[in-house]
């Protein structure tokens, strides 16, 4: 059994966080769960607080701390978890590395990939109505916090625009968020 101290910083709704949690459970690696209240869902916006930005300067989840080493990309986190010896003796990559890498790149929301070029990078298109619904419920104080504190210019402007404008009204009815 591994003697690593593992702390997972994650959000329940985050697809990438869910994938990392599955990997941890599959490998039977004990971990401490630190739920992060994301700025587009909660007024607290813990992912853009100074304390979390010291862990992940991009303000995104998941992030994992294994002993003193921090990794912030879900693809890299899963690779790192797979290298840890555990009592489950499970290999998360049951097919060759090239094929595994190809599947992971197609299905994760990975930084550096062109928007809508993979299944993972198209997901935000479908989740935008739900995100906008949550952003519009935030108090203006939270929107200002996003504007001044979010390290990612693209996300900060996107969330602020969602708050003040209605992007989803032009979507087909089946894609709009329903109460």
Regions found by a protein language model. Name each.
Residues 1-155:
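GST-like domain detector, emphasizing the conserved glutathione-binding G-site
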Residues 144-179:
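Alpha-helix-centered segments that form part of catalytic cores
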